[in-house]
Amino acid sequence: MPNKEEKIYLTADSFKQYQERLQYLQEVLRPQVIEEIKEARNQGDLSENAEYDAARDKQATIENEITEIQHILDNYEIIKTQTNRQVSVVRIGSNVSVVSLKDDTVINFQIVGALDTDPFNGKISNTSPLAKAVIGRKAGEVVEVEAPNKYQVKIVHVG
């Protein structure tokens, strides 16, 4: 889990999904599992009661997820999308195109927070080596990516 002071960057959609999930956990699943525990207790001896043990395990899982989501929602920052025409500096939320200086491969991606990362759909974490290299830079700049095998890319588009 990230440090208390560390910002957790989320898209507006992810933020809404976390809010909805938290509400579902608190208002639906938590009461259900409490009822399951009550029913299992009524079956008598708790020392060999598989239903009771399963309900308690389920309760622990739900409570852990609630705690994790509450932490996220206590430390989030919504990624602002860049809509104006004067977009020039790469930041979290930017759509970026770079070209590898090694083999002229073009890479298109959006920089998102770690919880929204989806590399198969072109969304990379702001903590990834490529994102770290381009954040704060402008189109036209050449940057070195600090990866196990360092490489250079030229930023060709920021949007």
Swiss-Prot record:
<dbReference type="InterPro" id="IPR036953">
    <property type="entry name" value="GreA/GreB_C_sf"/>
</dbReference>
<keyword id="KW-0804">Transcription</keyword>
<protein>
    <recommendedName>
        <fullName>Transcription elongation factor GreA</fullName>
    </recommendedName>
</protein>
<comment type="function">
    <text>Necessary for efficient RNA polymerase transcription elongation past template-encoded arresting sites. The arresting sites in DNA have the property of trapping a certain fraction of elongating RNA polymerases that pass through, resulting in locked ternary complexes. Cleavage of the nascent transcript by cleavage factors such as GreA or GreB allows the resumption of elongation from the new 3'terminus. GreA releases sequences of 2 to 3 nucleotides.</text>
</comment>
<keyword id="KW-0238">DNA-binding</keyword>
<dbReference type="InterPro" id="IPR036805">
    <property type="entry name" value="Tscrpt_elong_fac_GreA/B_N_sf"/>
</dbReference>
<dbReference type="InterPro" id="IPR028624">
    <property type="entry name" value="Tscrpt_elong_fac_GreA/B"/>
</dbReference>
<dbReference type="GO" id="GO:0006354">
    <property type="term" value="P:DNA-templated transcription elongation"/>
</dbReference>
<dbReference type="GO" id="GO:0070063">
    <property type="term" value="F:RNA polymerase binding"/>
</dbReference>
<feature type="coiled-coil region">
    <location>
        <begin position="47"/>
        <end position="77"/>
    </location>
</feature>
<dbReference type="GO" id="GO:0032784">
    <property type="term" value="P:regulation of DNA-templated transcription elongation"/>
</dbReference>
<dbReference type="InterPro" id="IPR022691">
    <property type="entry name" value="Tscrpt_elong_fac_GreA/B_N"/>
</dbReference>
<dbReference type="InterPro" id="IPR018151">
    <property type="entry name" value="TF_GreA/GreB_CS"/>
</dbReference>
<keyword id="KW-0175">Coiled coil</keyword>
<comment type="similarity">
    <text>Belongs to the GreA/GreB family.</text>
</comment>
<dbReference type="Pfam" id="PF01272">
    <property type="entry name" value="GreA_GreB"/>
</dbReference>
<dbReference type="InterPro" id="IPR023459">
    <property type="entry name" value="Tscrpt_elong_fac_GreA/B_fam"/>
</dbReference>
<dbReference type="Pfam" id="PF03449">
    <property type="entry name" value="GreA_GreB_N"/>
</dbReference>
<dbReference type="InterPro" id="IPR006359">
    <property type="entry name" value="Tscrpt_elong_fac_GreA"/>
</dbReference>
<dbReference type="InterPro" id="IPR001437">
    <property type="entry name" value="Tscrpt_elong_fac_GreA/B_C"/>
</dbReference>
<keyword id="KW-0805">Transcription regulation</keyword>
<dbReference type="GO" id="GO:0003677">
    <property type="term" value="F:DNA binding"/>
</dbReference>
